[in-house]
Amino acid sequence: MEKFTTHTGVGVPLTRSNVDTDQIIPAVYLKRVTRTGFEDGLFNNWRTKDPNFVLNNEAYRNGSVLVAGPDFGTGSSREHAVWALKDYGFAVVLSSRFADIFRGNAGKAGLLAAQMEQTDIELLWKQLEQTPGAQVTVSLEERTVTCEGNVYPFFVDDYTRWRLMEGLDDVGLTLRKEAEIAAFEARRPSFKPVTQ
């Protein structure tokens, strides 16, 4: 997983609330056994059926900072929802409320799910709608979002922040303990099974 300190990209105003994981990626796309290739399924029902959906607007098509309404990522636990967002090109999702399981899955996969005040989300929406294609800078170090000179604070828990800044997924965390694991295995009695 890559280290995340600061990201700048096109902001995408997703002015919808209660976006659940089935809306993020419909169940029909969950049959793959790999962790990549899910970008076509992202918001598929909206992208294919609603010509006015935000990602169908050329100015937002290459967005990487999704500014969503409250209660983003609710519903069933789908790592695929996070994978689809990342595969499409999103590095950050901003919302006033996230489902706990989505927020956890996001942090583990390198997607920043940053919580902001709803009033700030609405101000960002207004800016992004008035200036399609506007750049948004998200600083994990400063815990700030900047768009066209306006600076907004966001919240992310310290542990997730540390993991993202260090670029540590679950495997990376385990590998940091490689010496301790080897020492433990060396002390194990020989009659116990070992992993190869």
Curated annotation (Swiss-Prot):
One Pfam family of this chain: Aconitase_C
Protein EC: 4.2.1.33
GO BP terms in the entry: L-leucine biosynthetic process
InterPro entries assigned to the protein according to its UniProt record, in alphabetical order: 3-IsopropMal_deHydase_ssu (IPR004431), Aconitase/3IPM_dehydase_swvl (IPR015928), AconitaseA/IPMdHydase_ssu_swvl (IPR000573), IPMI_Swivel (IPR033940), LeuD (IPR050075)
Pathway: Amino-acid biosynthesis; L-leucine biosynthesis; L-leucine from 3-methyl-2-oxobutanoate: step 2/4
Gene Ontology MF annotations: 3-isopropylmalate dehydratase activity
Top class in the EC scheme: lyase
Record's GO cellular component terms: 3-isopropylmalate dehydratase complex
Keywords (A to Z) from UniProt: Amino-acid biosynthesis, Branched-chain amino acid biosynthesis, Leucine biosynthesis, Lyase
Reactions accelerated catalytically: (2R,3S)-3-isopropylmalate = (2S)-2-isopropylmalate
Protein role: Catalyzes the isomerization between 2-isopropylmalate and 3-isopropylmalate, via the formation of 2-isopropylmaleate.
SUBUNIT field: Heterodimer of LeuC and LeuD.
Family membership: Belongs to the LeuD family. LeuD type 1 subfamily.
Protein name (record): 3-isopropylmalate dehydratase small subunit
Gene that encodes it: leuD
